[in-house]
Amino acid sequence: MLGRFQPFSLVRSFRLGFEACCYPNQKCATQTIRPPDSRCLVQAVSQNFNFAKDVLDQWSQLEKDGLRGPYPALWKVSAKGEEDKWSFERMTQLSKKAASILSDTCALSHGDRLMIILPPTPEAYWICLACVRLGITFVPGSPQLTAKKIRYQLRMSKAQCIVANEAMAPVVNSAVSDCPTLKTKLLVSDKSYDGWLDFKKLIQVAPPKQTYMRTKSQDPMAIFFTKGTTGAPKMVEYSQYGLGMGFSQASRRWMDLQPTDVLWSLGDAFGGSLSLSAVLGTWFQGACVFLCHMPTFCPETVLNVLSRFPITTLSANPEMYQELLQHKCFTSYRFKSLKQCVAAGGPISPGVIEDWKRITKLDIYEGYGQTETGLLCATSKTIKLKPSSLGKPLPPYIVQIVDENSNLLPPGEEGNIAIRIKLNQPASLYCPHMVSWEEYASARGHMLYLTGDRGIMDEDGYFWWSGRVDDVANALGQRL
């Protein structure tokens, strides 16, 4: 399984192609070099992979060489309309400074775990990238977590450090009394809090850490907790390769991101959980992540931002698209830069897709996945669009419809949505959670992972969701 494939070869491919397309006067390749076929991500994986070194730092160098687009790595707009931008070079330096804080001040090292309860903010990304550099496993938690749930996740993950903002600090304090592994609390706030280290003060004086951990591709990178509706949330571990590189599938094949694109994910816009899969996938493509924080979802704010800023790619859930369409002045707005719209988080009605297309001239492409697996199926520009379909499976997954006895069902018959696992190309490259399932499935005599969803596959290989059958994870598009 471990071959000579180098992760940065994909980034280098973009470099050659981007030079040819956007810098015609420079000496460069005579033709656009396309990234390797996505199957190579499964068939040949390098033994070592570290997203911070192999992707972020490389885009930082391309940026220094003038071989990136005009937009930053991260673009933030405050509620007051104030703008801040961070280049890949700045993100690299600030993540290195954050790494010094984690290693030297918090005494964290390779193999330790850090829980982070922050909304999408620059500081949250610096800290997560610092964890990647050091081989520390980060555990994202929602700012909506209660003290009881924080205690549960801390005890389950055995985290040695927790990061939170001013609003969450009192909640955390009430939760950590019986969490024996927790040693350090790190506060991201303009104010200080007794018993907490001040991240903003520390990062002003911290030196950039020049070393990084030579992490293995299958070393743990992050732990996510499933939402769970009938049982306790489950831990799902993602590898360095799985989260750092495997999710580039979504940014490339579903969102069609290029280094000249700007992605705005509305799921992160109003205090939602930290969505690292979308962010890392965007940066893998050398594209820009756009942030505009809203206390609550506000259609008018969204429409104003889309018409004012050069956002090329919009990601939202179906309800958000519906609310935007229902705004009384929707038809008066013009989105000059917008060219790609994607949806996840539930089935989207054909009426919403049709109205959006009629007014904006843009299709909405749907995606389907789970915390345990990441993106499984998607519609995209490369296949015929069938409104309300989940689309077709994405590598490395073989998605099938099976009956209660795990027998393959023909097109048109409703059954369980399942993933057929091939041991010679294990899905554990994306998610080590699948390793234990392989062992369990082998003992049962078949290699199937049941998603807990019901659906149908049509004659053309498109999948259609019809409902839940048990509690595996959030129904559709569980965001990471």
Curated annotation (Swiss-Prot):
The keyword DNA repair does not apply. One of its GO terms (cellular component) is mitochondrial matrix. It is found in: Mitochondrion. One of its GO terms (biological process) is acyl-CoA metabolic process. It catalyses: a medium-chain fatty acid + ATP + CoA = a medium-chain fatty acyl-CoA + AMP + diphosphate. Keywords: ATP-binding, Fatty acid metabolism, GTP-binding, Ligase, Lipid metabolism, Magnesium, Metal-binding, Mitochondrion, Nucleotide-binding, Transit peptide. Belongs to the ATP-dependent AMP-binding enzyme family. Catalyzes the activation of fatty acids by CoA to produce an acyl-CoA, the first step in fatty acid metabolism. This is Acyl-coenzyme A synthetase ACSM6, mitochondrial. It comes from Homo sapiens (Human). The gene is ACSM6.
